[in-house]
């Protein structure tokens, strides 16, 4: 077993960067090989390493094990049971320039070979101790399932992905801060986790923290209650990468914004990377200090749009593949054509279809199965776009009352949404200008025409407004 594992690590050293070998492969410890089941048991020092190695390196290790044992082998990764630890120490580092162990076609150890003797407790402790990369994962709160490899790219998000890759490769230099904005379920959270995972996987021992804005607020409150602001500042200022999700939740929380401003200034001054997500463009954030908004604008701001048809199909096919379910393209196209708003909705629809198929014993996914499983969703998405639907959708988006669409009030926070709704009513329905005016509280057709022209002109000049209109159009089209 020892000879096999040394050879396995040596072969992997020829395929993987040194940082990945140090961070992920060397801490692994082979436990035993079950000849009856053809299962190789391998221990990882902690849950984070186990999940990462299983997802990223299991196929390579299984291929090398199959070559050595001359049969297909399944690798079972596990944690040391009961604290007893593995029975063999991790493979020591090969000295620079030392030749890799050579074997005749990776010939297997004879079945009757004596078992390895137990190692000293010190070796066991060393084998299970998490190295720097493992500690980073434990503290980072990163989701290891969200990587660049499984992020589906299309026109809607290709610029955001390119910027994210650049930041992952050159943190603190290229775009700092990186500000990603877009509607719910479009992949913002996936992308920032992918950046963090890529930096940790590089094995450089970076200090990373993913935190939702609500959790950051909670951290500030706890620091205030415990009179521990020095510790709070010391921790956040020491990070190499800070990922803040949904920063719009900082709205109205002045102490939180103040502490974040100090952390922002300290990190940027040291060329430490900050990445922020929001549901809206920085200048449209309500209740956020102007100092912070100016800092957000100082880096790169990128929008993530709702996915186009081809991208929605690709997302469905990728998700079905990850579930181990073959999906014909015609089925993916059927779902994608009827559900257009965001990735989360697509994945939810797919889960509903799969659950329906399993419950009813349908082995093959078909368009008919989708129609049956999604009939409630399809009845909504197939409905005609009406002025009433537009008014409700726009009111929900801008967080105003539908009644404000008909009222005579004209404050800016109501006038703009009302004009947007009039513009969309003209673009997306067959109603005439007088008919639209009647549905907006009996307004004259010239008022509607003025709103349509104003929004049309502004859309061509303002990227934020264009993005907002695109999101609303995609939502209304279903």
Curated annotation (Swiss-Prot):
Q: Where is this region: Domain II?
A: 71-140
> TM spans, by residue?
none
Q: Which InterPro entries match?
A: AAA+_ATPase (IPR003593), Chromosome_initiator_DnaA (IPR001957), Chromosome_initiator_DnaA-like (IPR020591), Chromosome_initiator_DnaA_CS (IPR018312), DnaA_C (IPR013159), DnaA_dom (IPR013317), DnaA_N_dom (IPR024633), DnaA_N_sf (IPR038454)
State the residue spans of region: Domain III, AAA+ region.
141-357
| Binding residue positions for ATP | 185, 187-189
GO BP terms, alphabetized: DNA replication initiation; regulation of DNA replication
Instruction: Give the span(s) annotated as Domain I, interacts with DnaA modulators.
Output: 1-71
Entry text on domains:
Domain I is involved in oligomerization and binding regulators, domain II is flexibile and of varying length in different bacteria, domain III forms the AAA+ region, while domain IV binds dsDNA.
Descriptive protein name = Chromosomal replication initiator protein DnaA
**Native species of this protein?**
Bordetella petrii (strain ATCC BAA-461 / DSM 12804 / CCUG 43448)
């Amino acid at each position: 077993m020892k000879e096999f594992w040394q050879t396995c690590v040596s072969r992997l050293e020829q395929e993987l960067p040194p940082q990945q070998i140090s961070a992920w492969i060397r801490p692994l410890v082979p436990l035993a090989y079950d000849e009856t089941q053809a299962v190789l048991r391998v221990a990882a020092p902690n849950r984070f390493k186990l999940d990462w190695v299983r997802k990223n390196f299991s196929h390579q290790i299984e291929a090398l094990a199959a070559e050595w044992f001359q049969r297909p082998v399944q690798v079972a990764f596990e944690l040391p049971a009961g604290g007893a630890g593995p029975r063999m120490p991790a493979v020591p580092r090969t000295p620079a320039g030392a030749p890799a162990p050579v074997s005749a076609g990776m010939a297997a150890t004879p079945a009757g070979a004596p078992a390895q003797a137990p190692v000293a407790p010190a070796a066991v402790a060393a084998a299970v101790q998490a190295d720097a990369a493992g500690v980073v994962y434990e503290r980072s709160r990163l989701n290891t399932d969200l990587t660049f490899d499984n992020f589906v790219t299309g026109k809607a998000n290709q610029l955001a992905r390119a910027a994210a890759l650049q930041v992952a490769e050159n943190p603190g230099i290229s775009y700092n801060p990186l500000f990603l904005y877009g509607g719910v379920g479009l992949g913002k959270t996936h992308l920032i986790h992918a950046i963090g995972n890529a930096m940790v996987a590089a094995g450089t021992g970076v200090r990373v923290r993913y935190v939702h804005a609500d959790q950051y607020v909670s951290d500030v409150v706890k620091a205030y209650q415990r009179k521990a602001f020095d510790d709070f500042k010391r921790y956040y200022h020491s990070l190499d990468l800070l990922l803040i999700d949904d920063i719009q939740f900082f709205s109205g929380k002045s102490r939180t914004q103040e502490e974040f401003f100090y952390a922002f200034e300290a990190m940027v001054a040291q060329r430490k990377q900050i990445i922020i997500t929001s549901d809206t463009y920085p200048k449209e954030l309500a209740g956020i200090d102007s100092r912070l908004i100016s800092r957000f604008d100082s880096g790169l701001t990128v929008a993530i749009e709702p996915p186009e048809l081809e991208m929605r199909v690709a997302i469905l096919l990728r998700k079905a593949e990850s579930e181990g379910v073959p999906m014909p393209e015609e089925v993916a196209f059927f779902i994608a054509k009827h559900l257009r708003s965001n990735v989360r909705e697509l994945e939810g629809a797919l889960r509903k279809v799969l659950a329906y198929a399993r419950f009813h014993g349908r082995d093959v996914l078909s368009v008919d199965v989708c129609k049956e499983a999604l009939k409630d969703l399809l009845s909504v998405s197939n409905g005609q776009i009406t002025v009433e639907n537009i008014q409700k959708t726009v009111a929900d988006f801008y967080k105003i009352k539908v009644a404000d669409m008909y009222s005579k009030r004209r404050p800016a926070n109501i006038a703009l949404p009302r004009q947007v709704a009039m513009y969309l009513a003209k673009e997306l329905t067959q109603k005439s200008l007088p008919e639209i005016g009647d549905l907006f509280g009996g307004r004259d057709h010239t008022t509607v025409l003025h709103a349509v022209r104003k929004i049309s002109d502004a859309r061509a000049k303002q990227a934020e407004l264009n993005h907002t209109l695109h999101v609303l159009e995609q939502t209304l089209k279903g």
